């Protein structure tokens, strides 16, 4: 090799190069937090979940406290779907793509059940004690388990079945407590929220099955399911005549209807995205723990901020549901939880070092 070649190689090696950044971006409300310490990422994402969803729950209950709002749950859902669709399109256009992978007919089915889930859930708030609605939404495992068996032919173990039984017991206890203390007990609310849970179970199974089959992304599913769902809801509110009563009511109270609905919808959309990011970064177990604590705080704040009757039976029922949720989590993460339990017991008994060396299950 000549001196000139060596000089050329050395010079080229000293030139600045564009090195590909291997750190995968982690977006929180448009900001990349990938280079922040892990503990700070957890604090930021968890804090965002609490703020967004506590605000979402507060706005949802506040809207239905408006005199005369009770019959217009589907109009509120229409506004929510339009905003979700617009946000979904903007997100896909900027960060992803709007290409459709899943067939239209599948999206028609997904959109129908998405409409049923969110529409019935929103409408039920007008007829239910809000904490009861939150407790019911915590118990999605029951219809998901049934849907998994019927739609995908899945088989579940005794732990999952036990969790579903405990959830059913918790719901029954909450309903009986509601019936005991609520002066405006209305069975229509329970029918609506039960229908929402059943539809939600069907959605999850259909989405999972077809996203795997056709390779569709979660962003694509949000865009098309909410877009088509908006058309479904608009057709329904026109044919039922609800829209013609809702428009004068919304215009008469424009800030407290359109304003609250916009805030409610944006908080909901951002909340969904933050939860998905939390799952991606820290896993489903940690994310479910955070969201479960958030739901518990939502129930507490509902009792503090909005006057409603209270009984200690609510606490008992909520505790049973919480136990069922973590029993279900244990079923999904049995191997890792068993490992952590063994380590904890070993440390507590003072033979951690010996156990980790000799017990093959501790390795």
Curated annotation (Swiss-Prot):
<dbReference type="GO" id="GO:0046964">
    <property type="term" value="F:3'-phosphoadenosine 5'-phosphosulfate transmembrane transporter activity"/>
</dbReference>
<comment type="similarity">
    <text>Belongs to the nucleotide-sugar transporter family. SLC35B subfamily.</text>
</comment>
<feature type="transmembrane region" description="Helical">
    <location>
        <begin position="281"/>
        <end position="301"/>
    </location>
</feature>
<keyword id="KW-1133">Transmembrane helix</keyword>
<keyword id="KW-0472">Membrane</keyword>
<keyword id="KW-0812">Transmembrane</keyword>
<feature type="transmembrane region" description="Helical">
    <location>
        <begin position="39"/>
        <end position="59"/>
    </location>
</feature>
<dbReference type="GO" id="GO:0000139">
    <property type="term" value="C:Golgi membrane"/>
</dbReference>
<feature type="transmembrane region" description="Helical">
    <location>
        <begin position="63"/>
        <end position="83"/>
    </location>
</feature>
<dbReference type="GO" id="GO:0005789">
    <property type="term" value="C:endoplasmic reticulum membrane"/>
</dbReference>
<dbReference type="GO" id="GO:0055085">
    <property type="term" value="P:transmembrane transport"/>
</dbReference>
<dbReference type="GO" id="GO:0046963">
    <property type="term" value="P:3'-phosphoadenosine 5'-phosphosulfate transport"/>
</dbReference>
<feature type="transmembrane region" description="Helical">
    <location>
        <begin position="257"/>
        <end position="277"/>
    </location>
</feature>
<feature type="transmembrane region" description="Helical">
    <location>
        <begin position="231"/>
        <end position="251"/>
    </location>
</feature>
<dbReference type="GO" id="GO:1990675">
    <property type="term" value="C:Golgi medial cisterna membrane"/>
</dbReference>
<feature type="transmembrane region" description="Helical">
    <location>
        <begin position="310"/>
        <end position="330"/>
    </location>
</feature>
<keyword id="KW-0333">Golgi apparatus</keyword>
<dbReference type="InterPro" id="IPR013657">
    <property type="entry name" value="SCL35B1-4/HUT1"/>
</dbReference>
<feature type="transmembrane region" description="Helical">
    <location>
        <begin position="131"/>
        <end position="151"/>
    </location>
</feature>
<feature type="transmembrane region" description="Helical">
    <location>
        <begin position="187"/>
        <end position="206"/>
    </location>
</feature>
<dbReference type="Pfam" id="PF08449">
    <property type="entry name" value="UAA"/>
</dbReference>
<feature type="transmembrane region" description="Helical">
    <location>
        <begin position="106"/>
        <end position="126"/>
    </location>
</feature>
<dbReference type="GO" id="GO:1990674">
    <property type="term" value="C:Golgi cis cisterna membrane"/>
</dbReference>
<comment type="function">
    <text>Mediates the transport of adenosine 3'-phospho 5'-phosphosulfate (PAPS), from cytosol into Golgi. PAPS is a universal sulfuryl donor for sulfation events that take place in the Golgi.</text>
</comment>
<keyword id="KW-0813">Transport</keyword>
<feature type="transmembrane region" description="Helical">
    <location>
        <begin position="157"/>
        <end position="177"/>
    </location>
</feature>
<protein>
    <recommendedName>
        <fullName>Adenosine 3'-phospho 5'-phosphosulfate transporter 2</fullName>
    </recommendedName>
</protein>
